[in-house]
From Swiss-Prot:
Domain of life: Bacteria
An example Gene Ontology biological process: thiamine biosynthetic process
Pathway named in the protein's UniProt entry: Cofactor biosynthesis; thiamine diphosphate biosynthesis; thiamine phosphate from 4-amino-2-methyl-5-diphosphomethylpyrimidine and 4-methyl-5-(2-phosphoethyl)-thiazole: step 1/1
Co-factor remark: Binds 1 Mg(2+) ion per subunit.
Species of origin: Nitrosomonas europaea (strain ATCC 19718 / CIP 103999 / KCTC 2705 / NBRC 14298)
Gene Ontology CC: cytoplasm
Source lineage: Bacteria, Pseudomonadati, Pseudomonadota, Betaproteobacteria, Nitrosomonadales
Cofactor(s) needed for function: Mg(2+)
Family annotation (Gene3D superfamilies): Aldolase class I
Annotated function: Condenses 4-methyl-5-(beta-hydroxyethyl)thiazole monophosphate (THZ-P) and 2-methyl-4-amino-5-hydroxymethyl pyrimidine pyrophosphate (HMP-PP) to form thiamine monophosphate (TMP).
Binding-site list for Mg(2+): 78, 97
EC number assigned by the record: 2.5.1.3
The name this protein goes by in its record: Thiamine-phosphate synthase
GO MF assignments: magnesium ion binding; thiamine-phosphate diphosphorylase activity
Family (UniProt): Belongs to the thiamine-phosphate synthase family.
Length: 214
């Protein structure tokens, strides 16, 4: 378990929400995460679809230590057992994962639960009713990390903000050229992976994304 540190940021999901890339080299991954955190990431999701359970545990635990240093909440993608083992700040679940209500029973009231809602506003409404703390829509643009996903119209963000009382995250193919349009349409946060961790200067890229919310 990660040792206690300074209190985490308060409030709902907002700003730059970084999602880690699939990377087997833990040292390189942690270095990239450190740069992103130094650049102003507000929330970080650990996601590695290619790692086995042992590597995920090692990587998530080390990344959690980094997040604690920067007082940034760590959300674990999909794996409830991993989120519980490292005492992560939250869990993100997709369409084929456990329900937010079940996740809440296991994690307790103080953890953050996010739900992928693709292009489905009804699913987002149900997620909020089931106790989700935020919902994510997308992909809004072609994405290297979210292949074969639903295409979401930008207008969905405006509609969601009118219907929901929880933060809305946009995801899928987001870069510095299109993030501003999504933010202007009402999303509280943009979830970014390739445009951040694939940048030559990760820290600067994180700063540029963060400044879009100023």
């Amino acid at each position: 378990m990660v040792p206690a540190a300074e209190p985490m940021k308060q409030g709902g999901v907002s700003g730059l929400y970084a999602i880690t890339p699939d990377m087997a080299d833990t040292g390189r991954l942690c270095d990239a995460v450190r740069q992103a955190l130094a650049g102003g990431v507000s929330w970080l999701q650990y996601r590695n679809k290619t790692a086995d359970s042992r590597l995920r545990l090692v990587q998530a635990a080390e990344i959690h230590l980094l997040c604690r240093q920067f007082q940034v909440p760590l959300i674990v993608n999909d794996h409830l057992d991993l989120a519980m083992e490292i005492d992560a700040e939250g869990l993100h679940v997709g369409g084929d994962d456990i329900s937010p209500a079940v996740a809440r029973c296991h994690l307790g009231q103080d953890k953050i639960i996010g739900v992928s809602c693709y292009n489905q506003l009804d699913r987002a409404i149900e997620a909020e009713e089931a106790g989700a703390d935020y919902v994510a829509f997308g992909a809004f643009y072609p994405s290297m990390t979210k292949t074969g996903t639903y295409q979401a119209p930008i207008e969905l963000l405006t509609a969601a903000k009118k219907k929901l009382g929880i933060p809305v995250v946009a995801i899928g193919g987001i870069d510095l050229d299109n993030a501003g349009m999504l933010i202007a349409s009402g999303c509280d946060a943009v979830a970014v992976s390739q445009a951040l961790f694939g940048a030559q200067d990760i820290q600067s890229a994180a700063r540029y994304f963060s400044e879009l919310f100023d």
